Amino acid sequence: PLLAALQALGMAQLIDARRPVPVIIDQTVRAVGKLPEGAAHPGAAGFINATLRRFARERASLMAEPLPDEARFNHPGWWVAKVRKLWPDRWQEILMASLSRAPLSLRANRRQGGQLAAAARLQEAGIGFRLMGQDGLVLDQALPVDRIPGFADGSMSVQDIGAQCAAQLLDPQPGERILDACAAPGGKTAHLLEMADCEVWALDIDPDRASIITNNLQRARVPLLSQDTTEAPGAATTASGQATGAIWGAHVLAADAGDPESWWDGRPFDRILLDAPCSASGIVRRHPDVLWHRQRRDIATFSATQARLLEKLWPLLRPGGTLLYATCSIFPEEGEKVVSAFASRQADCRWQREVRVPGWADWPQGGQLLPRSDELHEHDGFFYALLSKHQ
């Protein structure tokens, strides 16, 4: 594998051809001698030399040949075929969006001035951006977060525009008990608490990831609560500073959402956000490694996990409450099919297909956001389904 990788690296440099061909070939051949013992056969240097020289001679004719879709779009063949079948009119656009450079998108904290205040701080710092959605700002150029005014004090957080739809769809209200079932790294939890004076239970099965939730909530200036705390919970206030009487803050738990018996106190939740584990097929531009370590068979495994989590969490929702099912996937086996099967089995469940994100002109009726990168839209791929529980 190391020798093949070295050969591919040499060919990639010959295609780019920013340096003289003899230099590229010579340095690649020399690199063979730097490989670990046993990684290359005795004639490897000569083999690399010969193949690169031939590639350099025949490069024009080789590159003129039409590439298979797998090579042209740099996606596994099964992935290309699947997307092409699902969206025959948009498949190339979807694949190219997944290969685009992901922008740095920010979410303005509504409790610290919101989108307009964040925009003013960016303008003052000479940072180019465009407003998107109710709380979003997309930077013209990505920057380290320590150079973004307002990040350290929690007035802005990094979050994709598509991911910001979760809290807006769930629509938290003052005084409610809300469960964020798979909460790490905590962006959606913080957004819920920025929107309303509510009490959120934020869970993650991994203690290290639960710690990340805590860190992000502290930066966003959200009170951290505990189910057995001796400290006073955060007091919610109006814009004028008057107390509302509601509890405002987050309980962060390292717990398994699929095993409620181990952590649930028996009190039903008004709203539940289930951002379920998935293939991550909608966020490839941020995690390109997903393309090559994800296997076709993984989708069925994720679907089973998603269905199990829905079954386990539904009893925790009060009658009249709402559950938002979300994944960062573009495959219907993890989205529409999971929800349809669950709703057909659950007599007290209604899928609210008509719900839209406020201000989103062309929100997809089925809730499947596809990756897009253009003037009007700049977001990853997500699936959202809002489920209501009959009284």
Tell where the protein language model's regions lie, with residue ranges.
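S-adenosylmethionine
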Residues: 1-391
